[in-house]
Amino acid sequence: MELILNSLISDDLTEEQKRLSLDFLQDILQSNTKDYESYFSSRAVPGSITEDIAEIDAELSALDRKIRKTLLDNTSQIIGNILENDDRAQLDDIAKSLEQLWELDTNINKAADRNVTNDDINNESVSIDDFLEDDKEDNDTGRIMTTESNNLARKKKEDEFHKALSRLRNRISTKEDDKDDIRSDTLVTVLENLDSITDLMELPFLARTCIRTGHYQEAVMLYTHTTSLRSRFPGSTIVDEVCEKVLNEISTTMLSGLVKLLSTNVSVNSLKKILQYLNSIPPFDGKTNKSLLSVFLAMRYKFITDEIASYPLDVESSNESLIEMMVKRKIEVLREHVYMSLNVFLKSFLYDTNDLEIPFPEELESTVLRINGTNEEKEIEEKEKETKKEEYQKQDSVANNEEDVTENKSIEDVQEEVQGKVEGEDDGAERKTENEIENETVNKTEDKAEKEKEEEVNTKDNKAEKEEEEINKVEVTPEEPSKSIDNKAEKEEEEINKVEVTPEEPSKKIRTSKRENKIPTNAVMLQFVDKCITYVLKDLTRGLNSIKLSDSVCLQLVYCSFRLCDLNRNYHHLFLKKINDTSLFTTEQLARAIDKRAELASKYIYS
């Protein structure tokens, strides 16, 4: 462990500094109280290394401010100490050394000229020798080339050296006139603007701290501030360097962090903020949002696929309820996050669109129409039955009222007869008691009530027979619905044929109708929806094998499709087409689910 730590420490440190560094590293790496993962986390968690680094940086900045304050408080003393040291002696020494170098330079030039003349003489002698001796041609030409190249290189080096010396001499001669002002003006200016200079130099570190602590809005503000400084001071190398460092922090650390956040389970407001931050920094701060949309949908697709894969289907086939629950959760993930991702971008940014139409599946459309036709006929029959029942109930209520009236009259008649008999028969009044009279009246009323009940039963039986006969008359054979539909189709064809159309007009009408059905659609968003739907359906077919799904699952898929229809009708048609192409559900199941959904929300149009 000590060998590893010693290799990490620089050799430029003193023994005391090395000892302090070793103690600090051992305290961190061999601590029993600190968790390794939580301590070395990249986030600003309390007790982590990020927080320790931030505290140390804060202490360093505090010390820098303290030093700066002491320098500003003692500005006059510092300037006095600097100006008291007269450097004329040093300048004189430099001038003397330059004079010596100048003399050396002139001597070298003279020697070079002499060498050039000697080389010319030698060249002449060589040419004579070449003329006299042809066998030495190769050796002499090689020697001539080497001498010429050496002379040119020497002249070039001497010329550069001579230029450097002349520049230095000119600089000293110009500054001899104002020796008292040397370094005074620039130093005073730097000390007066020391606060602004230090603030400017701390901008890259401040941007890095804001990004690491999650203050992205402040980091974006720093980036805009540095760009404004570059426009205000276009020729300043210091400002350019500061801007480049801030841009490097923004385009690497901040960009990668925000893009990674797009592939996590974040809320709608967080998604909006992340997109706004990305839209304000390069490379997404251009005129169009196409690149931002591509990156955003790619990361959201990664998150959606990971969420769908987190609900496995590798459970026992006997546990159908658990399988159905997992399938419904997958569909719920698709419905929620696809809609949320598209809706956030649609509401916040501009995007390119093209007129496009994805037609409703023809097989599914025919089955839906057929089911709707049968349902309408059933509704008509039910309404007719309800109206007939209401009529019969009214008739029964009228008959019951009449029977009640007749019963009341019969009771009153019996009572009158009894009273007449009581009054007329004085002799038999002693024999008959009041109880006997009451018994007679009760028996008579009971006999009449039994007769009336028998009559009511007979009338009800007759009414029921009449109802059955009427219902049998109303019943339609299985062939009649299709005949009615065929009749409707024939009538529509006749109406179309009645309209006179020139040879050029049909194509125009067809084109106009197609244009009316087309709606503006973004190709990247449509591709995103297609990929998500395909992934879910493939995952279901691969995980379920031969297990059949219930109608409730089909209904939930249809709900998901109608949810996407709120954004764009083409997404809805594409979803239904994808479901119909798979073997998960039959066309009848899908049509019934659509019809069921239409009962709850009749505002949706299927084609």
Curated annotation (Swiss-Prot):
Q: Where is this region: Disordered?
A: 375-514
User: What GO terms describe the biological role, i.e. biological process, of this protein?
Assistant: cytoplasm to vacuole targeting by the Cvt pathway; intra-Golgi vesicle-mediated transport; retrograde transport, vesicle recycling within Golgi
Task: Name the predominant localization.
Answer: Golgi
Organism's domain of life? Eukaryota
Which InterPro entries does the protein's record reference?
COG8
Which of the residues bear the PTM Phosphoserine? Answer: 410
Where would you find this protein in the cell?
Answer: Golgi apparatus membrane
- State a GO cellular component annotated for this protein: Golgi transport complex
Q: How does it sit in the membrane?
A: Peripheral membrane protein
Q: Which UniProt keywords apply?
A: Golgi apparatus, Membrane, Phosphoprotein, Protein transport, Transport
What ranges does the record list as Basic and acidic residues composition bias?
375-394, 406-466, 480-491, 505-514
Additional comment: Present with 6440 molecules/cell in log phase SD medium.
According to its UniProt entry, what is the function of this protein? Acts as a component of the peripheral membrane COG complex that is involved in intra-Golgi protein trafficking. COG is located at the cis-Golgi, and regulates tethering of retrograde intra-Golgi vesicles and possibly a number of other membrane trafficking events.
Database matches in PANTHER family: CONSERVED OLIGOMERIC GOLGI COMPLEX COMPONENT 8, CONSERVED OLIGOMERIC GOLGI COMPLEX SUBUNIT 8
- Oligomeric form and interacting partners: Component of the conserved oligomeric Golgi (COG or Sec34/Sec35) complex which consists of eight different proteins COG1-COG8.
What family does the entry list? Belongs to the COG8 family.
- Tell me the protein's name: Conserved oligomeric Golgi complex subunit 8
Provide the species name.
Saccharomyces cerevisiae (strain ATCC 204508 / S288c) (Baker's yeast)
Lineage, please?
Eukaryota, Fungi, Dikarya, Ascomycota, Saccharomycotina
